[in-house]
Swiss-Prot record:
It is found in: Cytoplasm; Membrane. Plays a role in regulating placenta growth. May act via its PH domain that competes with other PH domain-containing proteins, thereby preventing their binding to membrane lipids. The keyword Cytoplasm applies. Keywords: Cytoplasm, Membrane. Its main location: cytoplasm. This is Pleckstrin homology-like domain family A member 2. Coiled coil: none annotated. The gene is phlda2. One of its GO terms (molecular function) is phosphatidylinositol phosphate binding.
């Protein structure tokens, strides 16, 4: 990914996050999912960002459970940290949108890596051809 890539907002709204402390209370957070991160705010005005989860640091969206009132899911990071979330109804749930954003991000990253590899190979071949042309 390059610095010139622009992050577009994919979803915005409220999500509940389980706290990391011993009591593990559910706290309502304002969240913004972009093409490269999930931003979690402590306030609805989005002035106080409490956490930014870059999609490159997310391994998977896991443990989806539907109850009568909530849909629960877990985001697993690349360092195997688990962050639990829940949303109030299936129609407004985030797990599928986050999973699709993650797949799209990984695809863009793979394509960029492939292009970089091909450019490197082409540069290397061009240098070899120039050396061969100069040889007696």
């Amino acid at each position: 990914m390059t610095g010139s890539d622009i992050s577009h907002i994919l979803k915005e709204g409220e999500l509940e996050k389980r706290s990391d402390n011993l009591l593990q209370f559910w706290k309502r957070k304002t969240c913004v999912l972009t093409t490269d991160s999930l931003n979690i705010y402590t306030d609805q005005q989005k002035k106080n960002k409490s956490k930014e989860l870059k999609l490159q640091s997310i391994k998977k969206v896991d443990c989806v459970e539907h109850t009568g009132k909530f849909v629960y899911f877990t985001i697993v990071t690349t360092d195997n940290k688990e962050i639990d979330f829940r949303c109030s109804d299936e129609k407004n749930c985030w797990n599928a949108v986050i999973a699709i954003a993650l797949v799209n991000f990984q695809n863009r990253k793979a394509i960029q890596g492939f292009k970089t590899q091909k450019e490197s190979e082409n540069t290397s071949l061009g240098q070899q051809e120039r050396c061969m042309a100069r040889a007696p």
